[in-house]
Amino acid sequence: MYNASEKRYENMLYNRCGKSGLKLPAVSLGLWHNFGDTAPFETMRQICFTAFDNGITHFDLANNYGPEPGSAEKNFGRILKEDLGQYRDELIISTKAGYDMWPGPYGNWGSRKYLLASLDQSLQRMGLEYVDIFYHHRMDPETPLEETMGALAQAVSSGKALYAGLSNYDGETLKKASAILDELRCPFIINQNRYSIFDRTIENNGLKDTAAELGKGIIAFSPLAQGLLTNRYLNGIPEDSRIMTDGRFLTKDALTEERLQQIRNLNGIAAGRGQTLAEMALSWVLRDGIVTSVLVGASRPEQVLDDIRAIQNLEFSKEELAKIDSVSL
């Protein structure tokens, strides 16, 4: 039987999620990779234990995380049932719906039909009565925003979610969605978007500024650019790397000679700060207080500990930020 460390809250930093009452750990655990049916179950357990023992209270999922879709929720549900469930009131569990999940016109995008059915399925897979945060996973070009936001509000009012979130939205759509959710008196508190030194889309599409203006939190996924912003690729592509073993999200084409040189230059800046490249990359995302938390993935427990070290040095000089920009933009 798992017993959590009594010192689990001693070293983690917790940030308020926008203007809400909810605080999230500066580092959260994402189950996008490594929690599907192809991963060893015992490794998943140890990753979750290491995370929680070190103050990571937030576990982020989606209906389609796997492989196969749904398997990450199912595996996490088993960990909850066997081990972590006794700590449910100390956990922030999120899930999402928005990508293709089942055949036909009702298993994708942003209709009320799809979102509420998907949430019920997610709760069943995880063995939960509610999730803490329920996200719409991506903007839907066809469904009226009022319908999608209405579904999020219904999820909360029904008691199946405590808060609503939006993922992969831009600033303009965020502003419209937020106004609708305000009218519905729905506690919308957080945006989840890709953000890293190599991907600054949210700085350019208005999402980051709008979230700050509206008092909404941001949680950043892929802050290590799928592992590129680590020491993994400093000397080329290892045989056991994600590029070689799982080409779904990161391909050889992503590691050009120019990109490799950028990684090496950034590694030099990190060394000057007394950090690893991964630590600096995570610190950079958290640098100005607008991003509430960074989502990290892990294929083994030690990686979780490595990532948590980023919070020990979140300060950057103007010179360091300028150097990072000069070698990465």
Q: Where on the chain are the PLM-derived regions?
A:
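Hydrophobic faces of well-ordered beta-strands that scaffold small-molecule active sites
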Residues: P25-L29, F59-L61, L91-T95, F134-H136, ...
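N-terminal binding-site loop/beta-alpha segment at the start of enzyme catalytic domains
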Residues: M1-L91
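Alpha-helix N-cap and loop-to-helix initiation/capping positions
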Residues: A39-T43, S71, N75, Y106-Y114, ...
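N-terminal small/glycine-rich loop or linker at the start of catalytic domains
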Residues: G18-G36, S94-G107, Y130, Y135
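Acidic-and-aromatic substrate-binding clefts and catalytic sites of carbohydrate-active enzymes
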Residues: F35-P40, N64-A72, D140-P144, G171-E172, ...
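Beta/alpha (TIM)-barrel catalytic core signal, keyed to glycine-rich beta->alpha loops juxtaposed to Asp/Glu
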Residues: Y2-E6, T143-L329
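Active-site groove signature of glycoside hydrolases
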Residues: L123-T143
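Short, acidic/polar
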Residues: T38-A51, G110-M126, L174-S178
